[in-house]
């Protein structure tokens, strides 16, 4: 009888202690959230890496990672199949994916939601030295790289070629490659011209220009107007002289917006915290009294210091070009801001 009475309080103590120590353990359980970006030679990957690190430091119990990949179209398909939580995509590709048009004909990505527009992506037409390409009238008969097959860059290439009255049949050869692959082919003189849609300066072009002379092929005003009339999600832009070595003149081009999109199944509170951490100073992490956690820079501010295109990531333009539904978590944040 004595042993039984002694045993019961002991068991109760063990249970109580297990509950005490299990509570914090459960509370500290971390979740994972990924951002699908693009190839290492583009802008998505470095900016995605900076954003992932910045937000991981601002939001407790979540590990955010950036994954390299095949960019816009592929990222939409990864979200559709719930293989990844979020990704960077062009706004025109996001529109096509959600509505099941263009390259997504009959295969809509209805679980695609927007968090924010980030920065302009410029359609850069890069020609190698000696290719005989100074303007768009020189493109016909050349060896073309329109981007990866099925990529957002290829979509942009086809739009530009349409505006110029050209198709793939007008070229001597067409190869589908990543930005890095395109840069190598141009360097090796195995291709004449490549389309690269990314925020400038783009790593693949910068690297190419350090070892080879290049030309940024300008679009004429008539072609730009024709393309924008047909595809109103594009806008006219100028790539400043000096963006790349040896390119000492301004280059007229067209641009679209890079957007951060997310799976609709991601919880509202998670996306709210991500959106708030992107735009607001401070942190969700509990700090010791007297520290400067409230002054911690926003994700956008950190991106601005890390990359030239990061300076274009602003709350003012967060909803520019958004043509798909906002995720409820993002919508909650923008409503609080009166947007």
Residues covered by each model-derived region:
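Short, low-complexity disordered leader/linker segments with a strong preference
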Residues: 1-31
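N-terminal (or domain-start) structured segment
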Residues: 28-97, 105
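Ligand-binding clefts/hinges and TM-proximal coupling segments of bilobed small-molecule sensing domains
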Residues: 142-159, 233-313
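Pocket-lining segment of extracytoplasmic ligand-binding domains
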Residues: 91-93, 101-103, 131, 167-267
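Bilobed "Venus flytrap"/periplasmic-binding protein-like clamshell domains
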Residues: 30-58, 62-63, 117, 121-188, ...
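An extracytoplasmic/periplasmic, membrane-proximal ligand-sensing/linker region
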Residues: 181, 188, 198-216, 226-232, ...
């Amino acid at each position: 009888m004595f042993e039984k009475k002694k045993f019961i309080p002991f068991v109760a103590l063990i249970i109580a202690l297990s509950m005490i120590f299990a509570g914090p353990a459960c509370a500290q359980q971390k979740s994972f959230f990924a951002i699908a970006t693009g190839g290492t030679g583009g802008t998505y990957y470095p900016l995605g890496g900076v954003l992932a690190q910045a937000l991981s430091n601002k939001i407790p119990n979540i590990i955010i990672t950036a994954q390299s990949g095949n960019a816009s179209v592929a990222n939409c398909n990864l979200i559709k199949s719930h293989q990844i939580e979020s990704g960077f995509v062009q706004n025109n590709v996001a529109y096509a994916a959600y509505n099941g048009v263009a390259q997504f004909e009959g295969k809509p990505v209805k679980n695609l939601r927007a968090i924010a527009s980030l920065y302009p992506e410029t359609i850069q037409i890069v020609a190698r030295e000696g290719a005989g390409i100074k303007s768009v009238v020189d493109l016909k008969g050349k060896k073309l790289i329109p981007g990866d097959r099925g990529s957002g860059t290829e979509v942009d290439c086809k739009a530009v070629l349409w505006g110029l009255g050209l198709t793939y049949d007008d070229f001597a050869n067409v190869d589908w490659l990543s930005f890095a692959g395109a840069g190598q082919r141009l360097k090796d003189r195995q291709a004449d011209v490549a389309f690269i849609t990314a925020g400038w300066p783009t790593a693949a072009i910068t690297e190419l220009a350090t070892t080879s002379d290049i030309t940024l092929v300008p679009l004429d005003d008539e072609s730009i107007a024709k393309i924008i009339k047909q595809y109103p999600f594009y806008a006219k832009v100028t790539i400043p002289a000096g963006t790349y070595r040896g390119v000492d003149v301004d280059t007229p081009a067209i641009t679209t917006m890079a957007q951060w999109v997310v799976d609709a199944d991601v919880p509202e509170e998670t996306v709210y915290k991500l959106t708030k951490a992107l735009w607001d100073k401070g942190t969700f992490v509990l700090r010791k009294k007297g520290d400067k956690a409230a002054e911690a820079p926003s994700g956008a501010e950190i991106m601005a210091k890390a990359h030239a295109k990061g300076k274009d990531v602003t709350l003012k333009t967060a909803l520019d070009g958004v043509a798909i539904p906002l995720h409820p978590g993002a919508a909650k944040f923008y409503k609080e801001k009166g947007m």
